[in-house]
Amino acid sequence: MTSSELETPPLDTARLLAERGDLDAAARILGELAADPDGPDRAQAAVGLAVVLEQSGDVEGARAAARTALATGHPEYAAQAACHLAQGFEREGREEQARGAWQAVLGVGTAAYVPLAHLALARLATRAEHLEEAEKEFRAAMETGAHGGEERIGAQAAAELAELMMDHAEPGAAAEVLLDALEFAPGDEVPGLRVQLGIAHLELACAEFAESVEGGADAGTSALAIELLARTLPLRGRAEDAGRVWSYGLEHEDETLAAEVRLRYHRDA
């Protein structure tokens, strides 16, 4: 070891060793620091040890180190450790353990990590089809992201919540979520949110067109609604539904309405 290395703080030495690929040497230094209950660098060293051990293939050792860091309650490194645990459990498909680790992130309460934890919990709830819990967590990710400097995570949460709502026939609620997100989303997230908002409006339009037809409007209005509905549905990948709408109009018992629909159907022929 050179004289300059002897003067380097142990944490920096361990980092340099890890960057050079000497994971065993890095782990030895970090392990000593993490084992000192009174050491000022214990939390940071334990997180570093978790990363190094995971890179070495020692998953259980990495988790033990992460739990050591978490137990310190350090606002930065305990939160990092809980994230490390959660992401590892997710990779293995251990969703209950992952949920517990993400909740530990919330327990630490460090603002920079809270939106990420809410978003992860929302995704877990979505996969488990716990939709009320998912919505609650998505909204929490939006709120904490927007007000905690993590606007990108908040925008991602809004996009995923809106998609979930549209999947469950709630385009109006989805549109409200997206409009809220556009108030704080980073510039490069805005185009995607606007596309989603347009899709939500298409779904709303389809519902209004259908309601107009079912509401017994006059022949001209009903024919217009049928045409608009039939031409809009394919934009949402619903070509078969569009065909059924055309058939409904073309075969309608009201001859005046059917004639109006025929004119509109053959407009582009």
Label the predicted regions:
Residues 31-35, 67-71, 103-107, 139-146, ...:
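Amphipathic alpha-helical segments of tetratricopeptide repeats
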